[in-house]
Amino acid sequence: MKFKPETGDFPLDQDSCKADYTRARELGRVRLGQRALYFSHLTWTGVLPLDQVERAYLRIEDIPVGMGCRRVPMGQHYLMVLLRSGAACKGALNGRKEGDWVLKQIHAQAPDIKIGYEAPAPGEAAP
């Protein structure tokens, strides 16, 4: 498995990432380890160290499912992570239960990370 920075450019130790990844809890396309969040991609795994995270929250998007006129919206839960650099990352979760759990764990592991959505100031774009 190849580990790469999810965003930005910083050195990674493949062996320590692999050890943390194998102990991490799978929550969908996101895993939470002791030191980082891991985002699954087709041919690689993105690493996002918790010390780069400023805020985390859940987002629910309605995704149309079905064919033709029988399309109905289905809610998909995402973990949204805003970084200190201003960038944002999004990873799909299995459901609300995993989302609530990961937010509690992130806060327990790194109390300086803000939890919950904060509306942007007037005139600013939402992440």
Describe the function of each predicted region.
Residues 1-34:
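Anionic N-terminal interaction surfaces
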